[in-house]
Amino acid sequence: MARETLLLVEKCAHCFSWYDIETGQRLYSLQLPDYPHEFVTDSAERYAYVGHYGVETSGHVGAGGHSLLQIDIRSRQLVRSIDLSPFNRLHGLQMDEQDRLYALSEEKAMLLVLDSPSRDTAARRAVPSGGVQSHLFALTRDGQTAFCMNLLSHTVTKVRPWDPLFAPVACHPGQKPEGFALSADERTLYVSNRWSQTLVAIDTETMQVKTCVASRDDPTRLYLQADGLRMLVTNYGERSLSIVDSLTLKELAHVSTGARAIALSFHPTRALAYVSLDDDRVGIFNLASCEFDGYIATQREPDVSKVVVL
């Protein structure tokens, strides 16, 4: 019988876990090297690829990790570790519509590409991000264009992973850009600036800021809802969520989270979001009522998640 399952990285428990969404029961945990972080799945949801960031946060020093961890979602087994040395502190991950895998080395500020991640033993290509401390990135569906969030240079840069002669195009949207969301038509990139405490909309063609509004304290991540009309903002400093209009970036609703919201994911068919909180819970947030329906108790520091049916 099919079961809706929440896949969850628990960063400070150093594992990848499977949770039953209906009961909140933890079904299994797979131990990983210290401080795994972001993950993506292929389109068939056969494999998850976890980046071994290897340090607790972007503010922690250290060489960090240099491997991608390939996990079989159904057998709950670590298939292999893909060593991407010398590229380290692997953080942002994306997959394009052809299931090609893109990984961002924060320390080396390089965007790496694995054409066939289930078989490749090394990156097949790499392009510089054009920034410093490149943390996360947005990717167009075809994989031809990426937009890197560069924490220390305070820039967002447009790069083309498949064009080795393309020079990165930079935009300065504010101080410490981190959160991002790409519109469905890929013409607008939304970015949250943690130190400036602003939300901006960037024209992806010109790389110019077209809208900028004040945010709440320390907006870390942005998540565009399926209808494209509303966006969720995790306000890390204020311990809250904001729901904003994606056209104007004006706040429509505001909800206290009690603890700091680290990341969230949407249910694929229901109006629910699963919000990872730093008090070791995942909150089940009802997008219709803008209230939490309940919580799932987790291990230390739940992070990136995804709902799958197994």
Give the role of each language-model region.
Residues 1-310:
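Predominantly soluble domains enriched in secretory-pathway, periplasmic, or organellar proteins
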